[in-house]
Amino acid sequence: MKTPLLRAIVICFCVSFASGCASSPEDDPKLTKQIFDSGVAAYDVKNYAEAFRIFSSIDDRDVAAMRNVALMLRKGEGTAKDPKAAEEMYARAAQGGLATAAADLGDMLLKGEAGPPDPKAALPWLMGAASAGHPVAALEAGQILEEGTAGPKDLATARKLYQIAADAGMDEAKQRLAALPPEPAALPPTEHP
């Protein structure tokens, strides 16, 4: 009689213990935010090695931490400069929905920081960030489309992108917008008998 009761108690204890263990710190958004904030604090006082360590500890579950790791890899802050690893980390954060990471990745590809400049590869990342309202990405994507460096020129889309950046207060976008040729006048509809 004691054996089944003891076994039931042990099973209940194990189930309770296991369910309590299933909730790890990785599952706690508040803890992740506290860790992230401590990384920001370390970065702000230029303790880059500590900031990099902190952001790296949560980069598997926080896209902003991924982006910060990428930025630090890009600049060589708190770690060795590694543009290729920065691009990979920016891509992960951008795929996680962070427009800033998409803008940063597009900028790196456009400038050729990890290889030759590649406006064609940069354009989709910049367009994604621009569609989320990122003004620098809108300006850079507009330039690519205005100049036709990634394919055919597209002045109509460049104009829209420059407008996004100009609306955010970017003077260069305002100047580029003003320098574009006027939009072609719409032709009146043709009537057919």
Protein language model features and the residues they cover:
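Alpha-helical adaptor scaffolds
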Residues: 71, 75, 84, 88-132
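Hydrophobic face of amphipathic alpha-helices that form TPR/SEL1-like repeat modules
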Residues: 35, 41-42, 57-58, 66-75, ...
